[in-house]
């Protein structure tokens, strides 16, 4: 099979066996660097917004780290555009969890800009319906009230302004 197909198979197997491989115990054995990242994100000594850069979108980087975060109590930011209107598309059970967002080469330019403005807490730069949804959750995102972690790849590494990022 092709390399991309093998990557998808590996990610599916990781997700299926998340308890074994992506728990803190599994990471201690199979991914100690990922475990340290998880500990840093969960450490109350490091409050506020976190930025994670990786050259890798799938296996070695953002893809696996996304699975690790989901396995360990984080939720992925989900936004959608229906009939031209941007809105949060988070599952009810994910509200209140720490949230991570992706800023990579797989999102549209518009989606990346909306994500960046959510991370920055610049509600006035967002479409009014989405801004109203966010204001009902928090006044801003200065300390990660909406999105705690932004994961970027090289597509997000140049020419963007991020506010209040501490780690």
Short names for language-model regions:
Residues 61, 159-161:
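Active-site helix-initiating loop/hinge in glycosyltransferases
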Residues 161-167:
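A short beta-strand element within the Helicase C-terminal
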Residues 1-149:
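Conserved Helicase C-terminal RecA-like lobe
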Residues 149-158:
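Conserved helicase core region in the C-terminal RecA-like lobe
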């Amino acid at each position: 099979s092709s390399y991309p197909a093998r990557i998808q198979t590996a990610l599916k197997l990781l997700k299926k066996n998340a308890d074994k491989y992506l728990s803190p115990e599994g990471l201690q054995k199979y991914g100690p660097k990922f475990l340290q990242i998880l500990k840093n994100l969960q450490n109350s000594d490091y409050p506020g917004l976190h930025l994670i850069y990786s050259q890798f979108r799938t296996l070695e980087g953002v893809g696996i780290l996304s699975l690790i975060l989901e396995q360990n109590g984080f939720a992925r930011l989900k936004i959608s555009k229906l009939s031209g209107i941007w809105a949060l598309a988070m599952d009810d059970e994910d509200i209140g969890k720490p949230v991570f967002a992706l800023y990579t080469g797989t999102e549209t330019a518009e989606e990346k800009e909306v994500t960046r403005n959510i991370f920055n807490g610049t509600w006035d730069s967002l479409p009014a319906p989405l801004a109203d949804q966010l204001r009902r959750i928090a006044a801003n995102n200065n300390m990660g009230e909406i999105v705690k972690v932004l994961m970027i790849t090289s597509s997000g590494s140049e020419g963007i302004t991020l506010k209040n990022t501490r780690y």
